[in-house]
Amino acid sequence: MMQSHIDFALATPEILLLVLALAVLLIDAVSSHPDRKTTYVLSLATLAILTVVSLFQWSNGVSGKTFNGMYVTDSFSHLLKITSYIAVAVTLIYGRVYAQSRDMLRGGELYVLTLLALLGQMVMISAGSLVSVYLGLELMSLALYALIALRRDDVVATEAAMKYFVLGALASGFLLYGMSMVYGSTGHLDLAEISRVIGSGQAKELPLVFGIVFLVAGLAFKLGAVPFHMWVPDVYQGSPTAVTLILGGAPKLAAFAMTLRLLVDGLHGLAADWQSMLMILAVLSLAIGNLTAIVQTNFKRMLAYSTISHMGFVLLGLASGVVVGKAEAASAAYGASLFYMITYVLTTLASFGIVLLLSRQGFECEQIDDLKGLNRRSPWHALIVLLLMFSLAGIPPLVGFYAKLAILQAVIESGHVALAVVAVLFSLIGAFYYLRVVKVVYFDEPVAEDAPLSATCVQRGLLSVNGALILILGILPGGLMALCVQVIKTSFAGL
């Protein structure tokens, strides 16, 4: 049903971000700071303002739909947006020194494009229609393409941008084709209306199933799941590390939100069809991601394949949410996936933060061997690396262990014990390459002369907080986990 009243207040964060991003762009054009300090500070201030606004909306129970149902505000969107603001702010702080030393601040494009990419992510998170899903996705993707190619004289980065652009266009084509078939079958673009039509049995079933296949393929690409993962290692390795950090953070949250909105909000009535697809993608991602990561010598490439395997766990959680007649089990499964995604992004930020910390003018810390002897140079940062690798491997008492345990509990609750066993086996295989990094850090001799760590006190302090959170959330995961489950319950009424 079309709404005659448009409530702009619901979309205050997006409107505010658009205005502030344009203001940052204009101020940058007349700024005299060669290192773009003004633009940097204004970007962080923008993120702080957005965090306050979203917290205010959430605490006051602001929710609803506007723009004819194309935009949704609920507790799910509030949580993911606030997490995205924090992730982007951490990204900008970590990458500041790196961007300066790589001449990436000749203009203020790095900060403005990051804010515009965030705007696209926010639209994806609050999407209530196939149209808004696609508009948000394209806004985010176009900004990310430009960010990867920001160093115009870097041939490797330009190649990575071209690969991402071509394959991203293909994935967008899959999504568009799938959306067109869903629209043709149901006669609606609004996700709530699509769900209603499917539930009433009025939709044309055959084209709808084909539409789901194309939608899942497009979603798998954006998440980086096998067999649509081919862009992940090349783009992660080829991009400047500061941009790789941007790619591995908030965009993953937006892709997860898009997946949940489309499959749970819009296509929940056909869960039996997409559940089997997600399970296949999950097992393939766990297998290919972990087995391929073992042979990598490039640290960024290893983390890329690690990302693929972790997306397998997220997809397992989403597939496990399809439990007929058990709304509590479904909420727990989707909540576990949300918890996993948030904590994974937290760990990824710190992992690439370490790479940025160890990189300096004329030296890229990209090889695993570049971490040799880190314990001798900086025992504290070596300890952070140990915490990160143990968490990614799923070793207690770190948050990665609890995140995987929650997913496995959801998988077993849904009756797929064999899948849980497979996931555990591949996690054990994956532990090898994480422990190899720890071995290099603590037991190998450094291959080069010690050099001072090129990072400010703010960056080192933030990295320490980042590492501490991984331990604290592992020891006390209950609060965040309960919040994730509650957010799912209140935001997805169809469960």
Curated annotation (Swiss-Prot):
Please provide, alphabetically and separated by semicolons, the GO molecular function terms listed in this UniProt record.
Answer: NADH dehydrogenase (ubiquinone) activity; NADH:ubiquinone reductase (non-electrogenic) activity; quinone binding
- Where exactly are the transmembrane stretches of this chain? 6-26, 38-58, 75-95, 107-127, 130-150, 164-184, 208-228, 240-260, 277-297, 304-324, 338-358, 382-402, 415-435, 468-488
Biological process terms from the Gene Ontology for this record are: ATP synthesis coupled electron transport
Catalytic activity, EC: 7.1.1.-
Q: Which GO terms describe its cellular component?
A: plasma membrane
Q: What does this protein do?
A: NDH-1 shuttles electrons from NADH, via FMN and iron-sulfur (Fe-S) centers, to quinones in the respiratory chain. The immediate electron acceptor for the enzyme in this species is believed to be ubiquinone. Couples the redox reaction to proton translocation (for every two electrons transferred, four hydrogen ions are translocated across the cytoplasmic membrane), and thus conserves the redox energy in a proton gradient.
Q: Which family does it belong to?
A: Belongs to the complex I subunit 2 family.
Give the membrane topology. Multi-pass membrane protein
Record note on quaternary structure: NDH-1 is composed of 14 different subunits. Subunits NuoA, H, J, K, L, M, N constitute the membrane sector of the complex.
Stored HAMAP family = NDH1_NuoN_1
Class of this enzyme: translocase
**Name the record gives this protein:** NADH-quinone oxidoreductase subunit N
Cellular compartments annotated: Cell inner membrane
Its keywords, alphabetically, are:
Cell inner membrane, Cell membrane, Membrane, NAD, Quinone, Translocase, Transmembrane, Transmembrane helix, Transport, Ubiquinone
Superkingdom per UniProt: Bacteria
Q: Name one Pfam family in it.
A: Proton_antipo_M
InterPro entries recorded: NADH-Q_OxRdtase_suN/2, ND/Mrp_TM
**Which reaction is the catalytic activity of this chain?**
a quinone + NADH + 5 H(+)(in) = a quinol + NAD(+) + 4 H(+)(out)
Is this entry keyworded Cell inner membrane? yes
